[in-house]
């Protein structure tokens, strides 16, 4: 089973990766906590770190028990400009500093219960979408960075960027701390929203100072690994080296467009039929490892049992199973204890590996048509505002949606 925490100094993220160790990330906090009633869909901001620290702490612990050895601070969308965007007054009522500090404290507490590191994370900003300057956008990142340095996180992650330009600015801002920086973009094989290829994105991120590059969110494991492969090829062609990282969705998205699952009509409240099984994730973990990815985790939709699947699949390489495997038989082997004989007959790898999963929805399509509005930085509808969205603005969007649906 997984090694317990101790008083010894932990190896850093680059020391671990350079030695060939497999790093297992955590899963999707905002989706998991929204379902549990602690995060509001829409703004997706992390004030739960202050308002409900016990919920955030418990989710960290479940990921740790499942095999994660990185506790990523719950600071997704915790920039000051996001916390006061479109009627979200968290910055005014609580303050961005308190949210970021609380998230760091919780992550450190849980990380020290095991052999885990703490990663401070920043993500894309309303300031960039509103065409603010490089200096202004970097200042937003620097506000969070000040907290991460004060709380002495082990390394930093710039994640969930749709535009490589902003991701580069984030990496440059974070690199000033002297701590290792990882950078992941929420892009598919077509590249970022300005059509910069995945290979070129990776090159720019490494040149900006990132030691670890890859993708997170927006796309399923299969598509995400296709993108990581393109990043790897781009780095090799440029003669650059970096560790590879993958933290995809736990939803199947073969029908999504360039912006990924946020274009799907089911986003965010109808995605459950698309959830990946634990066996899907074991397959993803093996394919990621074979591609050369050594930082393997998940994003939205990834629950602790998905992370456990990664840890179990890669247990031979890591040398141990996670603590959560104490209550989980490999490939369903624990089903041999079931009272019903047909269930006991499912206690084998061959059954679950080859099962074609039914949705139970006989009149529903298996694929959707993405909305594909095609908006990006500078588009009027993406210009952000401090005030809440008005009724008139909503009516205009409703009419546009009707028009798009009729096309």
From Swiss-Prot:
Catalytic activity: L-homocysteine + glycine betaine = N,N-dimethylglycine + L-methionine
UniProt xrefs under Pfam families: S-methyl_trans
UniProt keyword Cell inner membrane, yes or no: no
Signal peptide interval: none
Cofactor(s) in the UniProt record: Zn(2+)
Every Hcy-binding domain range: 11-314
Protein name per its UniProtKB record: Betaine--homocysteine S-methyltransferase 1
Organism: Bos taurus
């Amino acid at each position: 089973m997984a090694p317990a925490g101790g008083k010894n100094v932990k190896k850093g993220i680059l020391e671990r990766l350079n030695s060939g160790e497999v790093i297992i990330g955590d899963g999707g906090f905002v989706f998991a906590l929204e379902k549990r009633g602690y995060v509001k869909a829409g703004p997706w901001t992390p004030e739960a770190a202050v308002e409900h620290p016990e919920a955030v702490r418990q989710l960290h612990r479940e990921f740790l028990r499942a095999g994660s050895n990185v506790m990523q601070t719950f600071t997704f969308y915790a920039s000051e400009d996001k916390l006061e965007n479109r009627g979200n007054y968290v910055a005014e009522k609580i303050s961005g500093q308190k949210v970021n500090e609380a998230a760091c404290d919780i992550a450190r507490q849980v990380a020290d219960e095991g052999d885990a590191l703490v990663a401070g994370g920043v993500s894309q900003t309303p300031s960039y979408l509103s065409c603010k300057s490089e200096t202004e956008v970097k200042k937003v990142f620097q506000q969070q960075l000040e907290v991460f340095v004060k709380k002495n996180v082990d390394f930093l992650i710039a994640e969930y960027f749709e535009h490589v330009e902003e991701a580069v600015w984030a990496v440059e801002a974070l690199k000033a701390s002297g701590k290792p920086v990882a950078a992941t973009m929420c892009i598919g094989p077509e590249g970022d929203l300005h059509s910069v290829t995945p290979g070129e994105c990776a090159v720019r991120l490494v040149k900006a100072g990132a030691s670890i590059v890859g993708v997170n969110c927006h796309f399923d494991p299969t598509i995400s690994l296709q993108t990581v492969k393109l990043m790897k090829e781009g780095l090799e062609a440029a003669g650059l080296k970096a560790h590879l990282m993958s933290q995809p969705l736990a939803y199947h998205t073969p029908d999504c467009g360039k912006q990924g699952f946020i274009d799907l009509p089911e986003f965010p409240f109808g995605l459950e039929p698309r959830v990946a099984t634990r066996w899907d994730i074991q397959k993803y973990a093996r394919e990621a490892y074979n591609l050369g990815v050594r930082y393997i985790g998940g994003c939205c939709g990834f629950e602790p049992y998905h992370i456990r699947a990664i840890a179990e699949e890669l247990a031979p390489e890591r040398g141990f199973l996670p603590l959560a495997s104490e209550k989980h038989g490999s490939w369903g082997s624990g089903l041999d204890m079931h009272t019903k004989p047909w269930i006991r007959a499912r206690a084998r790898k061959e059954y679950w590996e080859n099962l074609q999963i039914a949705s139970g929805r006989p009149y529903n399509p298996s694929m959707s048509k993405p909305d594909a509005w095609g908006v990006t930085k500078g588009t009027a509808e993406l210009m952000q505002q401090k005030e809440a969205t008005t009724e008139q603005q909503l009516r205009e969007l409703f009419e546009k949606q009707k028009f798009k649906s009729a096309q």
